[in-house]
Structures are given as structure tokens and as C-alpha cells.
Amino acid sequence: MNDYKLYQCAQCGFEYDEAVGWPEDGIEPGTRWDDIPEDWSCPDCGAAKSDFFMVEVERR
């Protein structure tokens, strides 16, 4: 089990999974939320990084 977290956009529901990253924006798998630039925005709706919230997930 790992300690990667999942963050969800409050505007559109887009999910950022630290384990997966977002290679389309140059964010490699394993990139922690805190290491993503503050000016990064939701790829689906353009919402600010501050509009995301952490989601509790159980990984197996």
C-alpha cells in the first residue's frame, strides 16, 4: 500500500491522482500535490489549484 493521495476539482469533478500524475501537463507519476506549481489549473475546466480538495480513498 502507498500513501499517494487523490485530489478532486470542486468545479467539475476532475481527479488528480498523485500515483498517476498528469503527464499531459508534464507532471510525472508520483508527483505530490504540494510539488505541483501553484499556477497549475484543472485541465478540464480551468479551475485554480486552490479549488481542489483531497478525497479519502482506500487502495488495494
Curated annotation (Swiss-Prot):
Q: Cofactor stoichiometry and binding?
A: Binds 1 Fe(3+) ions per subunit.
Residues bound to Fe cation: 9, 12, 42, 45
- InterPro entries, per database record: Rubredoxin, Rubredoxin-like_dom, Rubredoxin_dom, Rubredoxin_ET, Rubredoxin_Fe_BS
What keywords sit in the KW lines? Electron transport, Iron, Metal-binding, Transport
- What GO MF terms are annotated? electron transfer activity; iron ion binding
Needed co-factor(s): Fe(3+)
A GO BP term here is: alkane catabolic process
The family this protein is said to belong to: Belongs to the rubredoxin family.
* Role of this protein: Involved in the hydrocarbon hydroxylating system, which transfers electrons from NADH to rubredoxin reductase and then through rubredoxin to alkane 1 monooxygenase.
Instruction: Please report the name of this protein according to its UniProt entry.
Output: Rubredoxin 4
* Lineage, top ranks: Bacteria, Bacillati, Actinomycetota, Actinomycetes, Mycobacteriales
Q: Gene behind this chain?
A: rubA4
